[in-house]
Amino acid sequence: CSIAVGMIIEIIVMYPIQHRKYRPGIDNLLVLLIGGIPIAMPTVLSVTMAIGSHRLAQQGAITKRMTAIEEMAGMDVLCSDKTGTLTLNKLTVDKNLVEVFAKGVDADTVVLMAARASRTENQDAIDTAIVGMLADPKEARAGIREIHFLPFNPTDKRTALTYLDGEGKMHRVSKGAPEQILNLAHNKSDIERRVHTVIDKFAERGLRSLGVAYQEVPEGRKESSGGPWQFIGLLPLFDPPRHDSAETIRRALNLGVNVKMITGDQLAIGKETGRRLGMGTNMYPSSALLGQTKDESIASLPIDELIEKADGFAGVFPEHKYEIVKRLQARKHICGMTGDGVNDAPALKKADIGIAVDDATDAARSASDIVLTEPGLSVIISAVLTSRAIFQRMKNYTIYAVSITIRIVLGFMLLALIWKFDFPPFMVLIIAILNDGTIMTISKDRVKPSPLPDSWKLAEIFTTGVVLGGYLAMMTVIFFWAAYETQFFPRVFGVSTLQRTATDDFRKLASAIYLQVSTISQALIFVTRSRSWSFVERPGLLLVVALIVAQLVATLIAVYASWSFAAIEGIGWGWAGVIWLYNLVFYFPLDIIKFLIRYALSGRAWDLVLEQRIAFTRKKDFGKEQRELQWAHAQRTLHGLQVPDIKLFSEATNFNELNQLAEEAKRRAEIARQRELHTLKGHVESVVKLKGLDIETIQQSYTV
């Protein structure tokens, strides 16, 4: 748009008003067209994303859709599975806690029956844990002949084995979700209450329950329904949290990403896992998503607000995941969703960033945007940081490209209209080639990822670009005026004059303007790539080398080149030194202008710059971390991970309000203290479970 406006103004002024010749007018229009269009933008952005995608793949996150990198940089909510992502998915069973429900059956028999209902090859985590409890895995099929095995499926939620014993009698065993196994039992009404009591007891300790049932098949055919099912026992399954999950969740909160646990397990298990991981226990059953909860404390809350504030949901089915994503997106959140099953595909497709976890099904991988090759939450958070670094490079270049477009269009338009200076189009082409070749290296530049979710803030990008570009254009206009209209440079530095003459052909002046525009334009990238002073944040080596080479070439051209076809003549090393000094002096205000723009857009421009003098503070990065982590601090406070330390009241606050605030602060402090204690206790219990020790004995021996 700016290029079109500049060309229209030039056409109107040069031909009807100034009556310029046809050819010089076309040359001036070409200068705006060649120099103003950011020709390298598609290449730079594509190469940056391609290199970033390769980097993500090295970290264990394969990107299927390039634009997912931008969306992951802006992700502020991550809905994560519990099993395998937050936990190890390496189950253990405590035989001492096995509950027996049938007469004449002991815990060893329950384990054996569960092992018979398990695969001996291509095992999942549950099968591995159950069969691993036997002294010899071969015992699972010892003395029997397998007739038919029913694998697990999301509908039945159980496995079953039909087999013949040594006497030729047919039997059938099944293991799976307790509710499904309980529905098979002939005496369901008699044992239902006790079964639920045991399940709740296990859940309060973070243990999942696995039901086991047995029946005889007197007909001797695998298709027959068989005799009555006997519910013989419940096995407790412990899935320990990953050693890095708690720290990863804290990192996510500090990065402005709110992690929500989405699990199909019971609510008590979800809360216990959340307590151990320090991610909060503000979790709700899936019925709350449909407004069917019996909890009066949340019945009045809108479902959208409930989902936004919850730490997680339990008892979730795939259709619930889709609903969660849809409602979070309606609240203007950039939402990521993890999944592994066929039924997760709709939610993965709906999410802004669908993430197929390690060992996901082909359907889940197909519907996702990113496929993980490593388990755990840490690989996702690492991918978020890498995505933000990639996005920061693209954002830096975009601001640079806008600035250069404005400075070329405005600067050369003013020179052409005020002094009728016809800059050679060929030299603009040289500037574009050198600048674009240098800027290609930004795809591997060293940058600091944004500490908060980032996105394309067009107001910031265009405002910064227009102001910086306008400043650079004025630099060029002032330099031209000083060199062409005055004797300032010859008088101060002793160089030859470029002042207006009767036979002026602008050849040396064109070389001087070329060097001035080329050097300061390339130096601008150091301003746009940094959040603080440009000379504080160290750039990548490749960018520095490319800049030095390009500037050396530009300087040699300006000093020695006398090209009649380009209408330039060498200006010598004296003028080259003057131009470098001029650009260096006017370079430093660029950082100050950048700070002023940033503070103006934040809505707190003048009080920060003039009163608090943030731009001139001695704090590292000008207090950047303190300001940008305020949002993350608020999120951690909401989760009870720390006590708020901001000033909660003004001088006009009355005593009643002070008392209320004091009580609230006391309550939050107690919540934070209890959460830390629970988290520590959870770590201890996890270690005890993994070591196979007696938890009751250990609890008597340690205190928190």
Curated annotation (Swiss-Prot):
EC number: 7.1.2.1
Cytoplasmic side: 49-395, 446-461, 529-540, 592-704
UniProt xrefs under Gene3D superfamilies: 6.10.140.890, Calcium-transporting ATPase, cytoplasmic domain N (3.40.1110.10), Calcium-transporting ATPase, transmembrane domain (1.20.1110.10), HAD superfamily/HAD-like (3.40.50.1000)
Membrane topology of this protein: Multi-pass membrane protein
InterPro entries in UniProt: ATPase_P-typ_cyto_dom_N, ATPase_P-typ_P_site, ATPase_P-typ_TM_dom_sf, HAD-like_sf, HAD_sf, P-type_ATPase_IIIA, P_typ_ATPase, P_typ_ATPase_HD_dom
Sequence positions that bind Mg(2+): D340, D344
Catalysed reactions listed for this entry: ATP + H2O + H(+)(in) = ADP + phosphate + 2 H(+)(out)
More about this protein: As many as 6 to 8 closely related genes may encode other isoforms of plasma membrane ATPase in tomato, like the LHA1 gene product which is 96% identical to the LHA2 gene product.
GO biological process, one term: proton export across plasma membrane
Active site, renumbered: D81 (4-aspartylphosphate intermediate)
Record localization: Cell membrane
GO cellular component, one term: plasma membrane
Function statement: The plasma membrane ATPase of plants and fungi is a hydrogen ion pump. The proton gradient it generates drives the active transport of nutrients by H(+)-symport. The resulting external acidification and/or internal alkinization may mediate growth responses.
Signal sequence interval, chain numbering: none
Gene Ontology MF terms in the entry: ATP binding; ATP hydrolysis activity; metal ion binding; P-type proton-exporting transporter activity
Topological domains annotated Extracellular: 17-26, 418-422, 483-507, 562-570
Pfam families tied to this protein: Hydrolase
Keywords assigned: ATP-binding, Cell membrane, Hydrogen ion transport, Ion transport, Magnesium, Membrane, Metal-binding, Nucleotide-binding, Phosphoprotein, Translocase, Transmembrane, Transmembrane helix, Transport
Name used for this protein in its record: Plasma membrane ATPase 2
Keyword Transport: yes
